[in-house]
Design a protein with these regions (language model features):
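Conserved acidic carboxylate
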Residues: 7-8
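Two-component/phosphorelay signaling modules centered on CheY-like receiver
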Residues: 11-33
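Short, aromatic/basic amphipathic alpha-helical patches
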Residues: 17-21, 68-72, 93-103
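Acidic, metal-coordinating helix/loop segments flanking the phosphotransfer/catalytic sites
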Residues: 34-50, 58-60
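Conserved phosphotransfer microenvironments
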Residues: 51-77, 86-89, 97
């Protein structure tokens, strides 16, 4: 089983991602974090293989705060893959920063919020 932790600002979006992953491959065991403050512990407890986090311009979901969580998770679980989700239409500058984080090797992948559930699942499957 591949364990995936999903930490999204929008609970409906988190549910959609979890459902898409489960429907794509029954090998995915998906856990949803209730809040960013609980994400690191959830990743450690579940021994997550992949952490998917939404990045927005709002507190607790800002890129800087997400990178802190990334650092905490990687310190305890270096093999955990980090994937950031960003809305490239409403957050153009933030989307550029997320893309640069990937280029700089700080994250394993990023996904734009406008992609299909099937594509998201396929990308996660390749990690």
């Amino acid at each position: 089983m591949r364990r995936v932790v999903v930490d999204m600002q929008n609970a409906l979006f988190a549910d959609a991602i979890a459902t898409a992953l489960r429907n794509f491959d029954s090998d995915f065991e998906v856990y949803q974090s209730d809040s960013p403050a609980k994400t690191t512990d959830m990743c450690v407890f579940t021994e997550a293989n992949i952490l998917i986090m939404e990045v927005t311009g709002y507190s607790s979901w800002k890129l800087e705060e997400r990178m802190k969580i990334r650092n905490e998770v990687k310190a305890q679980n270096p093999g955990c893959k980090i994937v950031l989700v960003v809305d490239e239409n409403s957050e153009k500058k933030l989307a550029d920063k997320v893309r640069l984080a990937k280029k700089d090797g700080l994250i394993d992948n990023f996904i734009y919020g406008s992609i299909s559930a099937t594509y998201l699942s396929a990308v996660i499957d390749t990690l």
